[in-house]
Amino acid sequence: MSANIISPRLVSRVWGGERLAALGGSGVATPPIGEAWFGEIGSQNQPLVKLLDVADRLSVQVHPTDALAAELHGAGSIGKREAWVILDAAAGAHLLLGRDPAVSADQLQHALESGSDVAPLLAKIPVSAGDVLDVPPGTLHALMPGLLVWEVQQPSDRTYRVSDWGRSSSERPLHQAEALRAVNVAATAQQVARVDWETAGTRTMITNDAFAVTVVVGPWSESMQFPHGAIATLISSPSMSGAASGPAGRVAGLTLQPLQSALITAGSVAMEIPHGSALLFASPP
């Protein structure tokens, strides 16, 4: 067998919702459930994939580069680059990502240093199902309510909160000093790519030194090469029946239901993807 189905680990989050409980999986999580993890922190040569059910605002936050993580947390610590594929979005949904181009880097730097609210200084990006966004380390961001997100990231949990919308909890401290070191005030919003649901085939959506994101849109019944440690997640077209429902697909002989994921353990992967479905692959660099 060249793939294994991953049992997700459900994680409670103050901003989570109700859509991930049906995935089952390992661990004990009490509602609201915000994340389903396919992989673990610290995995070697393997990205971490998560599903995020965003019912409330996430904190305004930033992640460090590998170099800064090692400086602040010790040798061997890594930063956190991530990317998002929007699987479902409520009407009018948006997110915050990078400095608003109408705001100068000096204005953002001053707000960070003074402890002012930086959320109004960030780019407000409307999103819909199928949008793909890259989030380099150093880029301020916040996911907003009404989103179901497939996230791929480096296997690190280094997150520096700049603000948390007035929520006060010892479990959710702010990290002003670290954030000041981490934020790249020059970073503006990255261009939004989109999954083309009308054209069957394969397309690499994002590639960088941390991971690659590839989408294979059905109908598709060919094999492809992927490195050991790649993770595949089946989703359904939002125009069909939504990301969380729809027909099953097959990868490396395994049947995957929508939102199930499999770990690829060998190079050549046979796939059977029905019309209206796609496989999202997160691969090591």
Where are the language model's segments positioned?
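Transition-metal
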Residues: M1-S104, S156, D164-A189, V213
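Short beta-strand segments in beta-sandwich/barrel cores
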Residues: E222-S223, P238-V251, S261, V269
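Ligand-binding loop in jelly-roll beta-barrel domains
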Residues: V54-R57, T65-A67, G79, A89-G92, ...
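Short, structured beta-strand/loop micro-motifs enriched in basic residues and often containing a Trp
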Residues: H110-L121, P247
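Basic (Lys/Arg-enriched) interaction patch that binds polyanionic ligands
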Residues: D117, A123-Q153
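C-terminal amphipathic alpha-helical segment
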Residues: Y160-F226, S245-A248
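Short acidic-glycine-tyrosine-enriched beta hairpin
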Residues: L122-D134, R250-A270
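His/acidic/aromatic-lined binding-pocket segments of jelly-roll/cupin-type domains
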Residues: V49-K50, L58, G76-S77, E82-V85, ...
